[in-house]
């Protein structure tokens, strides 16, 4: 393929029996008049986009069976987006050639069930002869045949139309949308259109009201529908599809039926215009660009939802919380994510989130979910927001909408430290502790689950728990992440050591518990800027001496760590426990590390930290548990 060739959006290949007029057809198109003597075959022709009705660069390949060997023909066919099989209406044997030679050769090139459209072109239709009777059954019997046209290179009849149809067959292909055997929409087209319907049904009542239909129309075609047009659409639907319209609104069945009508009437471009607006490419998959916008995240920066992102996901919650109880029941939750390819919040990972007594996701838990994935798995946030329709309606001129606007990249952590402040909202806290130290109980408390809940969860496990925590008057998200270090010898990955704060848990009733924390601390966090804190668990039990060089309090003093905090029984199951506030606080104000250590409110009042100090005073009081 030459460089020019690769530029072509549409590649049309002409094949057919000898002498049926392939070269003449291309000549007539190029010269805009009949040319008597044509060469055996023409070189590749490249037609620039601006002279084609659909504005696509088109290449036309004229093949002559005499000159080309079959391998060459097959290789040209394979590169084609659409194939015109030319026959002569004055020569029946060329009609037979379609079924005996050309269609089989195309299948042999692409495979039995290929999707490359074929157009049957009956040339030399300048006399009285036609072959419609023989052609229609061929079209019926071979679903890859998109359409058939009779034309004449001599009189110019339908010459430009053929090439226009060929282009349209590529840009607005039928086969992904329509199953000619069953005369129904294909499964993937149904699925795509169901997604479109759900996104457009903005109040989630199952109907497209006139307003919703009009917005949809404006979105896809740029102009509103007149009220007569609206009525016409609804009448056409209810005539052919009894359950298509109810309450004077379009139902899902009606919406699908409407698209079936478009397709059956040859107006595929209408359905394609809709699908493309919602991110689909020709394969009816969402395009890579739509799903995964390009973004670079500099080292030390993190990703969070932008105000638009927050607004979008929060509106989704409103839309799907049908009974307005502030929680998503399993069916509401399933409904919300039904346009996504895989269920995202499962029985297991819902344990990372706050739920109500019945185990239903709260608004808080739902928002926390988005904050979590945006921090730890941005690709997944992009993908889900794309499926959920975030980009829809956000496309600028010449640019398909994408999900980039849903995200903001935070300032580098180093700069935050230098400036003693951050506008980040989501912070990550590692939870480190020996086996049985009480990590799960501690973490689940942030989601509001207590001992009994944890006992029920059993071995099911989420390595994350996230919730909203108040720091000063602001709310921040604290993401707890359990590190799976079975022994202090295990290596921590860079993802793990890059946390904003580390909580080391040790069981006061187990003499070997603290050694684990001390070892991991010294190995990974000593001399780093990451704030760390020791947390004593199972404090209602009798305290035993820890088998370590020094007791925990002494250890903390040596390393200038804050005194160990007691995670008392009263804190279990409490998402608003002051311990979580303290962790969030340490994550938000890491430069106050030494202040946390000094733990002296008199001294504190003498140092000026700007706004941070106000909150800190409050926190230090809370700290003496
Ligand atoms: N009456 C009539 N004759 C045509 C028409 N188109 C082509 N012909 C004649 O048919 C003959 C074959 O035309 P070509 O364009 O060379 O056919 P081709 O399909 O390119 O032939 P090969 O390259 O040999 O396979 C020539 O004598 C043309 O003048 C047409 O529309 N009407
Ligand atoms: N009495 C008391 N028991 C606790 C406390 N915290 C945890 N436990 C119990 O200690 C045991 C271990 O707690 P988990 O939270 O599962 O500990 P873990 O660190 O997650 O354990 P692994 O994941 O197996 O390493 C469980 O039986 C808990 O019920 C506490 O504060 N007081
Ligand atoms: Ca030729
Ligand atoms: Ca509605």
UniProtKB/Swiss-Prot annotation:
Pfam families referenced in this protein's UniProt entry, alphabetically: EF-hand_5, EF_assoc_1, EF_assoc_2, Ras
Domain Miro as annotated: residue spans: 3-170, 420-625
Ranges of the Cytoplasmic topological domain: 1-601
Transmembrane regions: 602-622
Cellular component terms per the entry's GO annotation: mitochondrial outer membrane
EC number(s) per entry: 3.6.5.-
Knockout consequences: RNAi-mediated knockdown results in a hyper-connected mitochondrial network in body wall muscle cells.
Residues involved in GTP 1 binding: 16-23, 62-66, 123-126
Subcellular location, record wording: Mitochondrion outer membrane
Signal peptide (UniProt feature, chain positions): none
Every EF-hand domain range: 188-223, 308-343
Residues that coordinate or bind GTP 2: 433-440, 470-474, 537-540
Positions contributing to Ca(2+) 1 binding: 201, 203, 205, 207, 212
Residues in the Mitochondrial intermembrane compartment per record: 623-625
GO molecular function: calcium ion binding; GTP binding; GTPase activity
GO biological process: cellular homeostasis; mitochondrial outer membrane permeabilization; mitochondrion organization; mitochondrion transport along microtubule
SMART domains tied to this protein: EFh, RAB, RAS, RHO
UniProt membrane topology term: Single-pass type IV membrane protein
Binding site for Ca(2+) 2: 321, 323, 325, 327, 332
UniProt entry keywords in alphabetical sequence: Calcium, GTP-binding, Hydrolase, Membrane, Metal-binding, Mitochondrion, Mitochondrion outer membrane, Nucleotide-binding, Repeat, Transmembrane, Transmembrane helix
Its job: Mitochondrial GTPase involved in mitochondrial trafficking. Probably involved in control of anterograde transport of mitochondria and their subcellular distribution. Plays a role in maintaining mitochondrial morphology.
Family stated for the protein in its record: Belongs to the mitochondrial Rho GTPase family.
Name of the protein: Mitochondrial Rho GTPase 1
Species of provenance: Caenorhabditis elegans
Gene expressing this chain: miro-1
